[in-house]
Amino acid sequence: MSSSKAFVGARIFDGATWHDGEVLVIGNGEVATLSSGAPANAEVISAEGLLIAPGFIDLQVNGGGGVMFNNEPDVDGIARICAAHAKFGTTALMVTLITDRPDITAKAAEAGVAANKTGVPGFLC
């Protein structure tokens, strides 16, 4: 299987300009290029009629998906918050704690370190 993917047929927004008729090539999990055609070695994915745009980055998130970080200051809480926000286009976020007791603040800090070490998708530290 190829390590690069070519998304064809979509209308692509790069954050400043709309690109119609171009191919978005992803390599090693990152945007590699916009081109007029798919590379020969790429897995071609039809995105006909779809829009492709950058995800949102939210730098202050107190909760999501039924989880308030103050109530669940652990890695599972962070993962559930990140997953809930991802469904609506937020691809990266910073979980923030509302002012709380010192023991909750300590648990939240420990959870952030652990989430960073384990690579929770979407978590910024």
Would you name each region that the model predicts?
Residues 111-115:
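N-terminal hydrophobic targeting/anchoring segments and the immediately downstream early-domain regions
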Residues 62-64, 79-108, 121-125:
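Divalent metal-dependent hydrolysis catalytic cores, especially in the metallo-beta-lactamase
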Residues 2-3, 40-42, 48, 52, ...:
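Short coil/turn connectors at secondary-structure junctions
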Residues 24-25, 33, 58, 68-70, ...:
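Short, conserved beta-strand segments within well-ordered enzyme catalytic domains
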Residues 14, 116-119:
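A generic local secondary-structure boundary/capping motif
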Residues 1-39:
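N-terminal metal-binding scaffold of metallo-dependent hydrolase/deaminase domains
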